[in-house]
């Protein structure tokens, strides 16, 4: 008879399991894309979840072409203000260094709560010789009633596409001091990667954190803990041993999330549920519906980028027959 065996409980894919350095997710890599020049990312605030009825567009599904109910996440995506441009180049060691930086002259006073000095790199830009072009954008927290903090978040978005870095630089220059919308980044039917910091659970035990098996009923003193810290040798506790500690409040990336709908702020009433969304309120700006769930609680900043490993082709249109606006308060 074969020896019974199961895989280890708890993934080793995400280590160390510590709190994120910032509540704002960080995009560490950008995929290369083809086609016209465009911005490769966007950001919004998580509102909550509801469900929609739609025609199943998945050709290999058993319900292909039939109406189905699916859960969706509502993300409020007000326009982003383009407040600066950065050009990057590689040094001898392959590190990306800033070689050109320019800020708009029309800076909102709210930005000085985040950055006290705006230093420009005065080197004359020669885009053809550089490696990357980024937009420096700021969120409009003051236009979102559901967000308690009115201090804007400032971050970079890569510009991709086109035939040369010069085209991307011209695109960035044309948008400096203006705003960009979600439609400049993506549209319904396309995939995006979603980055967010998950809900924080605090200090939790072995069972909740790793899903290890409960010890027998007659075990001495404890049941909700591990049976051993490891072998005698090596004579230290290895990091593969499941132990109690921080759970949640960690950055995660969800790949290939389908955009089901995008709508302008004038049509916000088409998504506001009865009584408002829990812990958020009402949507007042542009919003987008994403298939399924995304990490993080309501009000958290959510970043999106072009998919890095897309496996399924985009579709031209998603047909939504019904959006549930029933109260989420349990009545």
UniProtKB/Swiss-Prot annotation:
Q: Which family does it belong to?
A: Belongs to the universal ribosomal protein uL3 family.
On subunit structure and binding partners, the annotation says: Part of the 50S ribosomal subunit. Forms a cluster with proteins L14 and L24e.
- From the Swiss-Prot or TrEMBL record, what is one GO molecular function term? structural constituent of ribosome
Q: Does the keyword Transmembrane apply?
A: no
Give the Gene3D superfamilies listed for this entry.
Answer: 3.30.1430.10, Ribosomal protein L3, domain 3, Translation factors
Extract one GO BP annotation from the record: translation
* Protein name (record): Large ribosomal subunit protein uL3
Organism, as annotated: Thermoplasma volcanium (strain ATCC 51530 / DSM 4299 / JCM 9571 / NBRC 15438 / GSS1)
Keyword terms, alphabetized: Ribonucleoprotein, Ribosomal protein, RNA-binding, rRNA-binding
- Can you list the GO cellular component terms from the UniProt entry? cytosolic large ribosomal subunit
